[in-house]
């Protein structure tokens, strides 16, 4: 085995193996290669990262609506044909004049069809008009349903009495009677206290109002379905309504 010797003061001769030199050389090459790779990766990262976040200006309604026309179809049940015909101008006027949409009633498919056109300025106009017509079809008055176009924080919620409690026969009829009350007194009281509008159509209950008010009205109606006396329900919703008024 070859060695390299150098003299020292103590007389000892240090021995260096050739294999050791090769190992050191290999380690130096690996460390230099790793350093180059790290620099290259860092450079790639720096190049990939943009210098500034891109800023896109907001699009106007005209730019968003350019392209294919959008359409909404609202089916009309048979029992709402006559009210729709009688109140057609009240429905037609705000949708066409204020929202800039096109509307028609398709006699063949029995749907109210609403679509956008070049006069449509607001992106959300089609959704507002569809909610307005849907509310009228469900049984709300035109004046009440019109609030869906004027205000942004109003919603529709529908559920069935049997979703709350599986009732049948006379038990179901009594539950409907508890919700309506004598001459509609209970329903009107819930509407006035919670500032909502309620439509009771057989086993279907439709509520129109803001999110918090719908929650209060729904809780009161569910308590009536479950059998709570109306006087207790009145007290509960009045207490909740007064707390909400104090909070805001």
Swiss-Prot record:
Q: A single GO CC term, please?
A: nucleoplasm
The UniProt entry's GO biological process terms, in alphabetical order, are: ribosomal small subunit biogenesis
Keyword Flavoprotein attached: no
Single GO MF descriptor: RNA binding
Keyword Nucleus on this protein? yes
The family assignment reads: Belongs to the PNO1 family.
Q: Which PANTHER family match?
A: RIBONUCLEASE Y (PTHR12826), RNA-BINDING PROTEIN PNO1 (PTHR12826:SF13)
Please identify the protein, giving its name as recorded.
RNA-binding protein PNO1
């Amino acid at each position: 085995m070859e060695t390299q010797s150098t003299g020292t003061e103590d007389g000892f001769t240090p021995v260096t193996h050739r294999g050791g030199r090769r190992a050191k050389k290999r380690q130096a090459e690996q460390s230099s290669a790793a350093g180059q790779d790290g620099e290259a990766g860092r450079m790639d990262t720096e190049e990939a990262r943009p210098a500034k976040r891109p800023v896109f200006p907001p699009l106007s309604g005209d730019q968003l609506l350019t392209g294919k026309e959008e359409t909404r179809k609202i089916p009309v049940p048979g029992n709402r044909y006559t009210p729709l015909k009688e109140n057609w101008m009240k429905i037609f006027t705000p949708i066409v004049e204020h929202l800039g949409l096109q509307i028609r009633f398709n006699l063949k498919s029995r749907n109210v069809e609403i679509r956008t056109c070049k006069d449509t300025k607001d992106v959300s106009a089609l959704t507002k008009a569809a909610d307005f017509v849907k509310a009228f079809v469900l049984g709300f008055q035109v004046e009440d349903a019109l609030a869906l176009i004027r205000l942004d924080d109003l919603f529709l919620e529908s559920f069935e009495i049997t979703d709350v409690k599986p009732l049948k026969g006379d038990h179901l009829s009594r539950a409907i009677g508890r919700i309506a009350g004598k001459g509609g007194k209970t329903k009107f009281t819930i509407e006035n206290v919670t500032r909502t509008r309620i439509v009771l159509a057989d086993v279907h209950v439709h509520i129109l109002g803001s999110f918090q008010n719908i929650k209060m009205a729904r809780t009161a109606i569910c308590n009536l379905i479950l059998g709570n006396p109306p006087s207790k329900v009145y007290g509960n919703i009045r207490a909740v309504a007064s707390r909400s008024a104090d909070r805001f």
